Amino acid sequence: MRRHWINALAPSLVFMALANVAHAQKAPPELAKFFDYTKAATVPATGGNVDRKAKCCDVTEWKLAPNSDALSDEIELTVIAPLKKGKHPTVLWLHREGQEVKRASFVQEAEALAASGIASILVELPFKQPYFARGNSTAGDADSIVAAVVDARRTLDWAASRPEFNIEKVAVVGQRYGAWAGTLLAAIDPRVDALLLMSPPGKPSGWLQVTDQPKAKRFRDAFNKTEWITYLAAIEPLDPEKWIQYAAPAKVYFQFASGDEWVQTLEQVDLYRAALQPKTRQMFDSDELLNEDARKDRALWLKKVLFGK
């Protein structure tokens, strides 16, 4: 069982709003501590059989044991590693939200990268329904986002002990909620060298109140007034727009969709402006799931930043 901690973030964000962002730096300790956890010398893990795919990769399913302070549940991973032995540049894939969404949604992209010498870790994240208040937790998705960041950090801890991963060259790819979690991860963890954000939200606590984007409006209309206020207050400290400045010096690439039914253009623009250099962006003629052009572009960008070419 994960504990609820996100409400403690709000007072610290006053400092964040006043911080000098002229120079690249990670989030200050008083903010980063809310994504902390008990680190162990080793991360206990159980691996399955290796599925070798000719001319491609070795695929292995792993489970990381919960950590001692119960801030992280068991973490399920899929590792897709090049056939050649040695430490490889590594991509950490963080999937979007959705009842049927799994880490396997990135398998084909990861296999293609493995053929080029890049290893991948696909993480099963703790959110299924978009913007969903779980049980009696008023924080709802806020707790799930924080838990996803902790899971990603523990995954990197484990990867550092493995022979197939070069932890000095790590890129994070996140889609929707995965992009939200990826932004927070890059803001606090210096191990992230590159960050690719697919259809990321920018300031959901603000834009969800006024947007006419179809999916966002339907979601807003499903709340009563009291629930809505509680929900917005819980996610506000985690708005990516507040944190993206701390991703630097990691390279950041934004993949936006012109037909995004959650996030409108002004929210995309504000998020991009809040990021520090080095950064780049591309708008794709697609819905928020993006298209084949975006997939090809991801592969090119990841190879460029991880191989330095």
Please provide the spans of the model-predicted regions.
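N-terminal cap/lid segment of alpha/beta-hydrolase-fold proteins
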Residues: 39-85
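Short beta-strand element of the alpha/beta-hydrolase
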Residues: 76-77, 87-96
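Gly/Ser-rich "nucleophile elbow"/oxyanion-hole loop immediately N-terminal to the catalytic nucleophile
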Residues: 137-176
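Hydrolase active-site cap/lid region
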Residues: 183-229, 247
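Acidic catalytic loop of the alpha/beta-hydrolase fold
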Residues: 258-263, 288-289
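Short alpha-helix in the alpha/beta-hydrolase fold that links the catalytic acid
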Residues: 264-272
